UniProtKB/Swiss-Prot annotation:
Signal peptide: none
Entry-annotated residues carrying Phosphoserine: 20, 81, 130, 162, 190, 213, 294, 345, 400, 678
Linked residues for Glycyl lysine isopeptide (Lys-Gly) (interchain with G-Cter in ubiquitin): 388
Chain positions covered by the region annotation AF2: 689-935
Protein name as it appears in the record: Progesterone receptor
Length: 935
């Protein structure tokens, strides 16, 4: 853009001089007829002092006396077409009349002369009235219930506007042009909206009555349409200018002499004939004006708060219609207290409120608010706070914070850029977060309607203060800390900050949770409510609306670390690093156990073998530490069966509910018992689960064999089958009492019993033979004991030799009763179907637990770690070898069952069903044996 410079200084305009145009006087122009039918103008109107000199001749060309305002509209369009770089085409028409000084030209002389006036500040002796101060620092005037009436607001406005008046030696009234030059008109209004200032003698609206000079004039926002006349039935804006009651009834005039008082500008929406969205009219009211400002300049200044968004009129109309379908605004005292700062004193009412919710310039204090008094841009909500739009993104960050009257909360409002902060601010707090509705704390009549209460569960308070009491309700505003405590309780670090927020913080005001932002270097957008989301840039991340509330996070296990199981080393109590050698231990105990086992150290305790092993004193006594490792079940072979047992934290299965009450000793009490450990003395401590297994061991079962008769093959096999039937019933009863077995599916329980009943019976045979006759004979039952001679006389001598291997292994290994009990349970869990069990996870957990119990049972008697590992290998190897041994028994049993009639051998009913249903599957390889070691 070409830079425009002034040619030179001009002579100051002297008010009252007939030869030069006066400040704000209309410019002369030709009497060319416009395309629109003109209306009568008044020749007796005084000079329009409210016209800003900065725009004199550039955007607002002076008109001749008697010229129709529509002619002026046409000429304004011609002059605006020659000015490049204008943000919007805005025409302001005033009352016709006055003398003319020069016609509008298209050469550079006009621009230079206008720029000379534009860049000259006002002098100290010349001033013009200005509208109230709240229009300068507060948000756009469309959002306001009342107008502050106190004249003391003018000096505060001059202090706030002082940064804008930096040049010295100016002329009267130029400050308004300077302020207008710094402001950017909304693109939503450009180029289809203009400001038309009708005269008091000729109304711009069809059917409007002619008002006298004291009646307030109206400025209406119209669509720029050259094809329609203003008197036609189809203009975009129709209706009468709304004169407000109360103090505004006898308000000022549209154009007054420099010494007269003019009313402030107010906005009254008007309904359109084609669109339901209200159009905005500017109405002047009675209020003192600050020197050096004109109403139109203030209007242009206030338009900076409109969001610069390319919003179509159809979308705006649809959005406004949606908002206006709610309850009509019930204004009055409740509304004033709900949306405006308290007006208890003149100083409070005249204090400028930066970023306030609703500046007091919509209607007079005594006037009843209009039913359609909703602004065109935004969700102006009634006191019921029917907030239907979630504010997110730039719309929540760019708008000025809503004012909350929270007791004890520090002010957290931000002045509009680039104005400095005012001397005093009412206490206010920012909205909780994007997407969350805010409720004022002052009025008792404010309530949340059903429209807002139907929101998502994310709509709740995220940040709570410690000192200020939180307001009741779902959408209560978050109070900040007490004044002087600095920022809010939980500032959002991820959100960008601005210089305005930093300045407010330095000035003593606490920054809001979401400071106002300046987008792309433009001034901050100070509009008050949500606009359409589709036209807003995504400043905040989209996941902000998905933040969990603190109340929900504290109740959810995902956010509560206390609900997670704490991994502690079972040896020293330190933090466990994993499962090492079959036990959940730390890295230190893992290395200690490995070195002690490989080095075969003979540690001796200097005390009584009861030293405390914890995180601090674990290195004091290696003997007690190694003993504790063995008691916990650490063995070198733990890695070999890790893939089978899926080792987890030690679990006491005695907590499982049993079908019949069984006295289970407390493990903590058992561990608290003192025990001694020495090379010549065994540990006198039995784990509680092993004690439980011992208590549920079946009683002695008799075979019912008649020893008085000579043995025959059929009689022996029949007696063995009868014994097997009784033992099968005993296995079913024992398994039901087994801790953890009832947790499996009922089908899995039946399958495991049918697959393992032969293994359990032959394993029990070996234990009884080892225990009662030291493995010298086969002790089937007290009434059926086969020695080697009887074995040879039987028809199944080879089978007896196979079964005889088990007690011999028991004798060789010197198996203890605790080891036998654990191995017996593992035999029950040693064979599963190829497709797995229904409750496979519970089965694996149960099997892993009993493997651990076997390790404990081994550690009860073994004095060294190496011997414990070797013994675990030997015992598990014995369990693996039983698969081949039992397969021989299955084959013989099935053959005998098939030839039972020929052999005259009786098979009981239950045993017959098991043999017929399961033995063919087992022999066909349709089962999966679980092995501890690879073959």
């Amino acid at each position: 853009m070409t830079e425009l410079k002034a040619k030179g200084p001009r002579a100051p305009h002297v008010a009252g001089s007939p030869s030069s145009p006066k400040v704000g006087s209309p410019l002369p122009c030709s009497q060319a007829a416009g395309p629109f039918p003109g209306s009568q103008t008044s020749d007796t109107l005084p000079e329009a002092s409210a016209l800003p000199i900065s725009l004199d001749g550039l955007l607002f060309p002076r008109i001749c006396q008697g010229q129709d305002p529509t002619d002026e509209k046409t000429q304004d369009q011609q002059s605006l077409s020659d000015v490049z770089g204008a943000y919007s085409r805005v025409e302001a028409t005033r009352g016709a009349g006055g003398s003319s000084s020069r016609p509008p030209e298209k050469d550079s002389g006009l621009l230079d002369s206008v720029l000379d006036t534009l860049w000259e500040p006002s002098g100290p002796g010349q001033s013009q009235p200005s509208p109230p101060a709240c229009e300068v620092t507060s948000s756009w005037c469309l959002f306001g219930p009342e107008l502050p009436e106190d004249p003391p607001a003018a000096p505060a406005t001059q202090r706030v506007l002082s940064p804008l008046m930096s040049r010295s030696g100016g002329k009267a009234g130029d400050s308004s042009g300077m302020a207008a030059a710094h402001k950017v008109l909304p693109r939503g209004l450009s180029p289809s909206r203009q400001l038309l200032l009708p005269t008091s003698g000729s109304p711009h609206w069809s059917g409007a009555p002619v008002k006298p000079s004291p009646q307030p004039a109206a400025v209406e926002v119209e669509e720029e349409d050259g094809s329609e006349s203003e008197d036609s039935a189809g203009p975009l804006l129709k209706g009468k200018p709304r004169a407000l009651g109360g103090a505004a009834a006898g308000g000022g005039v549209a154009a007054v002499p420099p010494g007269a008082a003019a009313g402030g500008l107010s906005l009254v929406p008007k309904e359109d004939s084609r669109f339901s969205a209200p159009r905005v009219a500017l109405v002047e009211q009675d209020a003192p004006m600050a020197p050096g400002r004109s109403p139109l300049a203030t209007t242009v200044t206030d338009f900076i708060h409109v969001p610069i968004l390319p919003l179509s009129h159809a979308l705006l109309a649809a959005r406004t219609r949606q908002l206006l379908e709610d309850e009509s605004y019930d204004g009055g005292a409740g509304a004033a207290s709900a949306f405006a700062p308290p007006r208890s004193s003149p100083s409070a009412s005249s204090t400028p409120v930066p970023g306030g919710d609703f500046p007091d310039c919509a209607y007079a204090p005594e006037a009843e608010p209009k039913d359609d008094a909703y602004p065109l841009y935004g969700d102006f909500q009634p006191p019921a706070l029917k907030i239907k739009e979630e504010e997110e993104g730039a719309e929540a960050s760019a708008r000025s914070p809503r004012s909350y009257l929270v007791a004890g909360a520090s002010p957290a409002a931000f002045p509009d850029f680039p104005l400095g902060p005012p001397p005093s601010l009412p206490p206010r707090a920012p909205p909780p977060r994007p997407g969350e509705a805010a409720v004022t704390a002052a009025p008792a009549s404010a309530s949340v309607s059903s429209a807002s209460s139907s929101g998502s569960t994310l709509e709740c308070i995220l940040y709570k203060a410690e000192g200020a009491p939180s307001q009741q309700g779902q959408f209560a505003p978050p109070p900040c800390k007490a004044p002087g405590a600095g920022g809010c309780l939980l500032p959002r670090d991820s959100l960008p900050s601005t210089s305005a927020s930093a300045a407010a913080t330095a000035a003593g005001a606490a920054p809001g949770l979401y400071p106002a932002l300046g987008l792309n270097g433009l001034p901050q957008l100070g509009y008050q409510a949500a606009v359409l989301k589709e036209g807003l840039p995504q400043v905040y991340p989209p996941y902000l609306n998905y933040l969990r509330p603190d109340s929900e996070a504290s109740q959810s296990p995902q956010y509560s670390f206390e609900s997670l199981p704490q991994k502690i080393c079972l040896i020293c109590g330190d933090e466990a690093s994993g499962c090492h050698y079959g036990v959940l231990t730390c890295g230190s105990c893992k290395v200690f156990f490995k070195r002690a086992m490989e080095g075969q150290h003979n540690y001796l305790c200097a005390g009584r073998n009861d030293c405390i092993v914890d995180k601090i004193r674990r290195k004091n006594c290696p003997a007690c530490r190694l003993r504790k490792c063995c008691q916990a079940g650490m063995v070198l072979g733990g890695r070999k069966f890790k893939k089978f047992n899926k080792v987890r934290v030690m679990r006491a299965l005695d907590a499982v509910a049993l079908p019949q009450p069984v006295g289970i000793p407390n493990e903590n009490q058992a561990l608290s018992q003192r025990f001694t450990f020495s090379p010549s003395q065994d540990i006198q401590l039995i784990p509680p689960l092993i004690n439980l297994l011992l208590s549920i061991e079946p009683d002695v079962i008799f075979a019912g064999h008649d020893n008085t008769k000579p043995d025959t093959s059929s009689s022996l096999l029949t007696s063995l089958n009868q014994l097997g039937e009784r033992q099968l019933l005993s296995v079913v009863k024992w398994s039901k009492s087994l801790p953890g077995f009832r947790n499996l599916h009922i089908d899995d329980q039946i399958t495991l019993i049918q697959y393992s009943w032969m293994s359990l019976m032959v394993f029990g045979l070996g234990w009884r033979s080892y225990k009662h006759v030291s493995g010298q004979m086969l002790y089937f039952a007290p009434d059926l004991i086969l020695n080697e001679q009887r074995m040879k006389e039987s028809s199944f001598y080879s089978l007896c030799l196979t079964m005889w291997q088990i007690p011999q292994e028991f004798v060789k290994l010197q198996v203890s009763q605790e080891e036998f009990l654990c191995m017996k349970v593992l035999l029950l869990l040693n064979t599963i179907p190829l497709e797995g069990l229904r409750s496979q996870t519970q089965f694996e957990e149960m099997r892993s637990s009993y493997i651990r119990e076997l390790i404990k049972a081994i550690g009860l008697r073994q004095k060294g770690v190496v011997s414990s590992s070797q013994r675990f290998y030997q015992l598990t190897k014995l369990l693996d070898n039983l698969h081949d041994l039992v397969k021989q028994l299955h084959l013989y049993c099935l053959n005998t069952f098939i030839q039972s009639r020929a052999l005259s051998v009786e098979f009981p009913e239950m045993m017959s069903e098991v043999i017929a249903a399961q033995l063919p599957k087992i022999l066909a390889g349709m089962v999966k044996p679980l092995l501890f070691h690879k073959k």
